[in-house]
Curated annotation (Swiss-Prot):
Coarse class of the protein's main subcellular location: mitochondrion
First and last residues of the transit peptide: 1-23
Domain Lipoyl-binding as annotated: residue spans: 50-136
Matches recorded under InterPro entries: Biotin_lipoyl, GCV_H, GCV_H/Fam206, Single_hybrid_motif
Gene name of the encoded protein: gcvH5
Name of the protein described by the UniProt record: Glycine cleavage system H-like protein gcvH5, mitochondrial
A Gene Ontology biological process term: glycine decarboxylation via glycine cleavage system
């Protein structure tokens, strides 16, 4: 009995830390906590999902190109609905890059202050310290339509070969 309780507690603890990450063709990643999505398996799109958005290491920023400035949209009032896509602007030494969220009708809810203070985290640590922002959305199908890690890796490999 004690072992069973310990196993259930361990399973519960591990499930709280499980994240699902999906990738877009424009090299953005979105990660959601598994529990965040637990009520959405019935295709009910009214539940709010919180996701972390970032740029992958295969993104449009050259590893040797310093990010000078990042511009996020204004975080709007909770009740405001924005039909415009979420767009983040990255200024580098050589270019300005516009990143459009692959999730439709998402809302910016917080910005990674560390990335504003140290923009090169996007290059040096894109999947951990270099995350960009937190978004909320309600349609899990938008998230599920993105690529998983294997699909994304194959996409990147095939894209490099075609060039």
């Amino acid at each position: 009995m004690f072992l069973f309780k310990t196993t259930n507690n361990l399973r519960k603890s591990l499930s709280n830390k499980f994240f699902c990450t999906r990738y877009s063709k424009n090299h953005l990643w979105i990660s959601i906590n598994n529990n965040n999505n637990s009520n959405n398996n019935n295709n009910n799109n009214n539940n709010i999902i919180i996701g972390t958005l970032g740029l992958t290491e295969n993104g449009p920023i050259n590893k040797f190109d310093d990010v000078l400035y990042i511009k996020f949209p204004i975080i709007k009032d909770e009740n405001q609905v924005d039909d415009e896509p979420l767009t983040i602007s990255l200024d580098t030494i050589s270019d300005q890059i516009l990143l459009n969220s692959p999730i439709r009708n998402c809302k910016l809810i917080s910005i990674n202050q560390d990335v504003l203070d140290y923009p090169n985290y996007i290059n040096s640590s894109p999947m951990s310290k270099g995350w960009l922002c937190k978004i909320k959305f309600s349609n899990i199908n938008d998230f599920n339509s993105l690529m998983n890690k294997n699909e994304y890796d194959n996409y990147c490999k095939n894209k490099i070969i075609k060039i």
